[in-house]
């Protein structure tokens, strides 16, 4: 994976990490993460697929696949603690 792609993925993780820190008991919507990470939904969805495949993020899509929620997995949370604290 090249550095540009990795930097983009870390940006999504950081945005999700910040959202989770601010609202720990509330699931993060795709719309909120798209806004916080400053990515169009189509780009965000592709990047989330890579993060899900890595085991760092869990994604739950609503019927139709347009809306949903995303959260850090245990390993994603551990990675976030290492990178962002």
Label every model-predicted segment.
Residues 64-72:
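Minor-groove-contacting beta-hairpin "wing" of winged helix-turn-helix DNA-binding domains
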Residues 1-16:
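Short alpha-helical segments that sit at the start of domains
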Residues 74-85:
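Short, amphipathic alpha-helical interaction segments positioned at domain boundaries
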Residues 22-35:
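Short acidic, hydrophobic short linear motifs in intrinsically disordered regions
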Residues 14-21, 84:
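Short, locally clustered residues in the helix-turn-helix/winged-helix DNA-binding domain
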């Amino acid at each position: 994976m090249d550095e540009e792609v990795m930097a983009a993925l870390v940006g999504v993780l950081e945005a999700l990490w910040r959202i989770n820190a601010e609202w720990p008991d509330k699931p993060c919507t795709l719309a909120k993460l798209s806004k916080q990470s400053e990515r169009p939904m189509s780009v965000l969805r592709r990047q989330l697929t890579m993060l899900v495949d890595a085991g760092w993020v869990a994604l739950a899509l609503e019927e139709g696949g347009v809306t949903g929620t995303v959260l850090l997995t245990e390993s994603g949370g551990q990675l976030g603690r290492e990178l962002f604290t």
